[in-house]
Amino acid sequence: IDPHKGKAGAREVKRLVRDFGVRGFKFHPTMQGFFPNDRDACYTVLEACAEEGVITLFHTGQTGVGSGMRGGMGMRLKYSNPMHLDDVAVDFPDMPIILAHPSFPWTEEGLAVAQHKPNVYYDMSGWSPKYFPETFIRYANSILKKKMLLEPRRMLTTASFKKQREC
């Protein structure tokens, strides 16, 4: 869903949920060019998501798209700082929000938002465990362990997680 679509995007959310059983939507602020907390740019679509009771997942942190390319292919990383989702979590306290990926280079900001807001969860996929910062591991094994999500096709046991960390 393009958050810039406003009312048309909100109608699309409702249609997809009601007619096709869609249970959530992924947003990629860097690729879609928006700040998640920009009320004018995307709150109409987010309001529809909240009303329909669906999960929202936001790409956070660096993206591989454009990495190393001239001008980063126009991708602006600033849009994917997880701190922008703090406002979204306040404004939509009943809407589940997932921070996709460890949010590098803003990992600690993502951890703070997930710890502070009960409706915010952290997805650990898309980043090799060997690059997880120690703070991320500490939070994942303690105060956020019930809010950490793993990509289903890459479920890691403790042993395989340790093995990947050592690689």
Task: Provide a role label for each language-model segment.
Residues I1, T30-G33, G72-M73, I98, ...:
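Conserved short-loop catalytic and cofactor-binding motifs
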Residues I1-S67, R76:
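Active-site gating/metal-coordination segments in enzymes
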Residues K5-G6, F35-R39, K78-N81, S103, ...:
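A conditional alpha-helix N-cap/helix-loop micro-motif detector
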Residues A8-R11, N37-D40, M83, E109-A112, ...:
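Generic recognition of short, well-ordered alpha-helical segments
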Residues R11-G21, T44-E52, D87-F92, L111-K117, ...:
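Acidic (Asp/Glu)-rich catalytic clusters
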Residues T63-K78, K117-N119, Q164-C167:
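Active-site gating loops and adjacent loop-to-helix segments of metal-dependent hydrolytic enzymes
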Residues G68-H101, E109-G110:
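Aromatic-anchored, glycine/proline-accented short structural segments
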Residues P96-I98, P102-C167:
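H/E-rich (His + Asp/Glu) clusters that bind or coordinate divalent metals
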